[in-house]
Design a protein with these regions (language model features):
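Acidic (Asp/Glu-rich), glycine- and aromatic
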Residues: 154-205
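Boundary at the C-terminal end of the N-terminal hydrophobic targeting segment
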Residues: 17-19
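Sec-dependent N-terminal signal peptides
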Residues: 4-15
Length: 258
């Protein structure tokens, strides 16, 4: 009897328990046109995307899985998958601002490109999730983002009546005098697209086969937009419009889209 007792206790000690990610729906308006279904592993959001069509996004809260399990578009009464297995990716490059030699935050020529800087990849832990309604906007906030001295969350905002959605790393730091440059995009362990398309600065459309390789190719594009094309549809990616832009003597397309 004693031997079986100890064996049973040993088995309990090694029994794996799957971590569940809590989903907070307290600030979600269930009368919203955006419909939400949630479990410990998935959040499914369906919303009107204009012209009588519906869009659907499935988020995977499991730690080792891509965040965006699938993106779907309803056309002709049936769902078509645009892409699957996508992960938002952000790189933050931070450097020191010179707030002493001239006019504090009003300084214009502190030459940050010649000062020490470090690039961090934003890491996601998927600690918790919350869905909230703000008028015709619905925000999904996933806590547990970290990049160097920055901490925060990932926020996805859906817009009723549009296929547009915004993905943002909302982060802050207590470190003073920090300049920030960021890269943002979507990655996948497989190739979700058949082609990658863009318009050049003259407005001519281009597309190339999507291939898997170790290096990205920077191109000069119009509207800072690239398009992933699949059998089920296309997804256009572009950064949010500038809310503030410093005065420029010249303006150049530096081919920063990749």
């Amino acid at each position: 009897m004693s031997m079986f007792k100890h064996l049973f206790l040993l088995c309990l000690f090694y029994l794996p328990v799957a971590a569940q990610v809590p989903v907070d729906l307290h600030n979600y308006n269930n009368k919203s046109a955006v419909k939400v279904q949630s479990s410990s592993e998935l959040i499914t959001l369906t919303w009107p995307a204009g012209d009588g069509r519906q869009a659907r996004m499935v988020l995977d809260l499991q730690a080792e899985m891509p965040l965006i399990k699938s993106l779907d578009w309803q056309a002709g009464g049936r769902w078509q998958q645009i892409a699957s297995g996508l992960d938002p990716v952000f790189f933050l490059t931070t450097g020191k601002r010179d707030l002493i030699s001239q006019n504090g935050w009003n300084i214009f020529f502190d030459k940050t490109d010649k000062l020490p800087r470090t690039t961090y990849a934003v890491q996601w832990r998927k600690d918790s999730a919350a869905v909230s309604s703000d008028g015709t906007h619905t925000v999904i906030r996933i806590a547990g983002a970290k990049a160097g001295p920055f901490n925060g969350a990932l926020e996805i905002t859906l817009f009723e009546g549009s296929g547009l959605f915004n993905v943002a790393a909302v982060m802050s730091t207590s470190k003073d005098s920090t300049a920030i440059l960021y890269d943002a995009g979507l990655t996948a362990t497989h190739i979700p697209w058949q082609k990658i398309g863009w318009a050049d600065p003259q407005g001519n459309m281009h597309s190339v086969p999507a291939v898997n390789g170790p290096h990205a190719t920077n191109v000069a594009v119009k509207y800072r937009t690239i398009i992933g094309e699949s059998k089920g549809g296309s997804l256009a990616l572009f950064p949010a419009p500038h809310q503030f832009f410093y005065p420029l003597d010249n303006c150049f397309n530096q081919s920063f889209t990749w």
